[in-house]
Structures are given as structure tokens and as C-alpha cells.
């Protein structure tokens, strides 16, 4: 086991200065205990092993149980940890030991998430539960709060007086790979939007917390989701779009259609692309639509947040007849702030400037900040940061139960509507968007045409990436 771990560190550790003597010292603390997670007897022997290991290394029993398992095992593991004495419920004013780290998905809908929370809270207090969302551990995502609240030049503009709309894109070139069975149950909405992209929406739209404490920051993130306008179940197709990839070419390589993937039904209506229009009903964001989209087998791998600012109220240069100027003025968002999450982490700001010459011609330019250039190529991975935070007991970058439940509640109308209605069916709503039949977008494209219709209904268009 230790040799396998060593090989993995050498193989996957980015820019690590591997020292054999350091590894040998560290490896003495690595142990492997196989067993059946559903059998109570396994936990009794695990308890004995942990006590023995603690004595051997002179440490007390402060345990973190990381549930990187199928979701169906979450409850059996937690209940067995409790019955064996390995998991003890602590008061909120007591140290949060032991701790349990839970991977997504946390439930598959609102009802299942509530049941899971109820069962877990019967065994552990909320401050002992760490629901991991690796997007919150990404450096660029963590930088959103710093960018907004540590720089006075941006926050005064961060409202509906100056911002026209916000686009959040998560695009993947990969298909479902070996996860066909899982993806059939999840789809793009549950796999990406319910957790990762909702966290991005919250970070962009949240109010300044009164401190950087875990509770203060998580309170503000949850308030955003509670302010998102609830979707009319009868008008789902006017604010939510779904798609499924067909065969095509991605980055020059041939790709099969989703329905031909392993462990995927030949008539599957599971979405591999989803796009939503959100409205946040509060003083800061009223009238500013948030467009979010996530899809597989798209043209390019990229995740970004694009904040589109409004055009100046008086188009001073609009009557000057030159090609360069007209191209700038035709853009409804001459200023766009882009926070690039992956693969190239950074921030860019697009603005108009005068092109050198005897006449006044405007040209769009971009100022770029790149993490690799400023801080070196290696930045800690999301999981490095999150695992460290779970060790030191800082839950700031973990999802709290009320956030998870609010997110599921918000998406419930879509979750219930899509399986009940085939993609090609046009709903009775006047503004409904025809989306099918599946498959409705070619692998290597930017998704179904319906997503352009969704954002185009308010005069906007997706950024060219």
C-alpha cells in the first residue's frame, strides 16, 4: 500500500521536489485496513486499530472519516461509526471531533437530501460534517471574495446600476467516460449545476459578510440562493434548457453519441447539457439575469464567470463613421470582467480604447492577470486546500446543510419536469423553448441551439470562447 501511495505521489504530484527521506518518514504513518463498510464487526476492529496506531505514534484519537464512497454507503457507514463509538455527537460549543467528510452528490433531490441530513444529524452535529465541493477549493473561486471585497474600485460597480448580466459557463470536452451508470441517474443539472455552479452564483452575488468566519460567509452565500426567484413549474421550458450530445468530433477526435456510451440506455433522455436563467430578487441584483450553462462534449474545456457591464448611458462615439468604432459600439457589453476558473486561472477585463492614429477609432483590448505568471505555475489543488481545511477545522469552503437544501429546493421544478416530459414536447407556456428531440447537439459544438434562444430572449448572447 505504501509503495502504491509513493508511486502515486511521484506520478501525480505537480512540481513536487520529492525527497526519499521525507517520504520514508511520512510513509510510516500510512495504514490500510480493508473491510466491508456495511458490516458492524469491521468497525470494532477499526476502532482497535486506530487506538493502537494512536499509541504507536503518540497521538490522541482525533479522527476524520472521508467518505469517498458511493452515496448509498453514506448512511450505513455513519450509523456503524456511531454504533461502534467511533462517531460521537458533539455540542456546537465542543471541539468538532470526530469529523466526517462527504463527497457529492448529497442526495439526488430535495426529499433525499432532507432525509440524509436528518439521519446524519441524529449522529453528528452540523459542525462535524464537511460536505466537500472541490470548486470552492479552486484558487480563482476563493479569489472572488478577495477580488470583490479587498478592492474598492470594483464593489461600488457590483450591482444592477452598472452590471447588465452575468454568464457562468462550465464546458467539458470529455464525455461521460466510464461513468455512464452514474450519469444516467444524475445528468448535467444534478452533477454540476446543483452544487458547483450554484456556489459560483452565490460567491458572485453575495453581500459582504461581517467577518471571514465560516458561519458569516456561509450565511451570505445561502442568502443569495434564498433570494433567487422560484421557478414556475408550468413554465420550466422558458427558463431551463437541456441537451444531449450526438456523435461528432472533439479536438479533432471522433466522439460517439451519448446513447452509445457504455451503460447508457439507447433511448436515454438524460441531459448532458443544461442551461438556466436565474433572477435574484433583492436590492442589488433586481433586473440582472444570471445565465448558467454546463455541458459535456463541447468545443473547448473552460470554466469561467463573465460579468457584462452596461454600455455608457450616452453613446458619445456612436456617430463616428469608422469600422473599428462601429464594431465596438455594436457590442452591448463593451466592458466584460472574466474570472477564469480553469484551465488557465486568472482574471481579465475588456475595455475600449483609442487606437493610435490621426482619427478617433476605438478598439477592444483586454488586461490579463494570470496566476501562473504572477505566482508560478504550481498552485495548490482544490483538494489540497480542502483536505487541509478539514484537518484544521475550518468549514468555510464546505457546503452547509441549508445551502444544499435551498439549492435542491430551487431546482425541484426542473428536476420534476424533465423526466416527465420528452425533450421534443412544446409546453403550453407562450415563452417555452422547443429543445428536442435528443440528441440535439453535435459533439464538438457549443450545445443545443435552444441555449442560444434562451439567452437571446432578453437580447443577450453567449460569449465566444
Feature-to-residue mapping (PLM):
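Secretory/organelle targeting and membrane-embedding segments
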Residues: 1-102, 106-465
Amino acid at each position: 500500500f505504501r509503495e502504491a501511495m509513493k508511486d502515486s505521489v511521484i506520478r501525480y504530484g505537480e512540481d513536487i521536489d520529492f525527497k526519499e527521506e521525507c517520504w520514508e518518514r511520512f510513509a510510516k504513518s500510512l495504514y490500510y485496513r480493508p473491510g466491508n463498510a456495511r458490516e458492524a464487526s469491521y468497525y470494532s476492529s477499526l476502532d482497535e486499530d486506530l487506538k493502537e496506531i494512536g499509541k504507536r505514534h503518540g497521538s490522541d484519537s482525533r479522527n476524520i472519516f472521508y467518505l469517498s464512497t458511493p452515496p448509498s454507503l453514506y448512511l450505513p457507514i455513519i450509523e456503524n461509526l456511531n454504533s461502534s463509538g467511533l462517531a460521537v455527537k458533539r455540542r456546537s460549543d465542543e471541539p468538532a471531533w470526530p469529523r466526517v467528510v462527504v463527497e457529492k452528490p448529497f442526495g439526488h433531490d430535495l426529499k433525499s437530501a432532507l432525509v440524509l441530513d436528518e439521519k446524519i444529524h441524529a449522529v453528528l452535529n452540523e459542525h462535524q460534517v464537511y460536505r466537500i465541493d472541490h470548486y470552492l477549493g479552486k484558487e480563482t473561486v476563493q479569489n472572488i471574495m478577495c477580488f470583490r471585497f479587498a478592492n474598492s474600485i470594483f464593489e461600488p460597480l457590483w450591482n444592477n446600476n452598472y452590471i447588465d448580466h452575468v454568464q457562468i459557463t462550465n464546458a467539458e470536452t470529455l464525455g461521460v467516460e466510464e461513468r455512464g451508470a452514474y450519469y444516467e441517474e444524475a445528468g448535467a443539472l444534478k452533477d454540476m449545476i446543483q452544487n458547483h455552479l450554484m456556489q459560483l452564483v452565490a460567491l458572485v452575488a453575495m453581500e459582504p459578510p461581517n467577518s471571514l468566519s465560516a458561519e458569516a460567509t456561509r450565511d451570505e452565500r445561502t442568502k443569495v440562493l434564498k433570494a433567487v426567484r422560484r421557478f414556475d413549474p408550468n413554465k420550466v421550458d422558458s427558463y431551463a434548457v437541456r441537451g444531449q450530445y450526438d456523435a461528432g468530433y472533439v479536438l479533432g477526435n471522433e466522439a460517439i453519441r451519448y446513447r452509445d456510451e457504455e451503460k447508457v440506455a439507447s433511448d436515454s433522455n438524460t441531459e448532458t447539457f443544461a442551461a438556466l436563467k436565474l433572477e435574484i430578487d433583492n436590492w442589488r441584483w433586481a433586473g440582472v439575469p444570471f445565465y448558467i450553462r454546463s455541458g459535456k462534449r463541447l468545443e473547448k474545456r473552460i470554466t469561467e464567470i463573465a460579468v457584462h457591464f452596461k454600455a455608457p448611458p450616452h453613446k458619445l462615439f456612436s456617430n463616428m463613421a469608422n469600422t473599428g468604432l462601429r464594431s465596438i459600439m455594436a457590442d452591448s457589453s463593451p466592458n466584460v470582467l472574466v474570472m477564469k476558473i480553469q484551465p488557465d486561472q486568472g482574471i481579465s477585463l475588456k475595455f475600449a480604447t483609442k487606437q493610435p492614429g490621426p482619427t478617433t477609432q476605438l478598439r477592444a483590448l483586454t488586461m490579463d492577470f494570470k496566476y501562473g505568471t504572477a505566482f508560478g505555475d504550481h498552485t495548490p489543488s482544490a483538494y489540497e486546500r480542502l483536505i487541509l481545511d478539514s484537518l484544521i477545522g475550518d468549514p468555510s469552503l464546505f457546503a452547509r446543510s441549508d445551502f444544499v437544501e435551498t439549492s435542491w429546493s430551487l431546482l425541484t421544478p426542473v428536476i420534476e419536469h424533465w423526466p416527465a416530459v420528452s425533450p421534443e414536447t412544446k409546453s403550453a407556456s407562450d415563452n417555452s423553448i422547443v429543445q428536442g428531440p435528443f440528441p440535439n447537439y453535435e459533439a464538438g459544438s457549443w450545445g443545443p441551439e435552444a441555449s442560444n434562444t434562451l439567452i437571446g430572449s432578453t437580447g443577450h448572447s453567449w460569449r465566444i470562447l
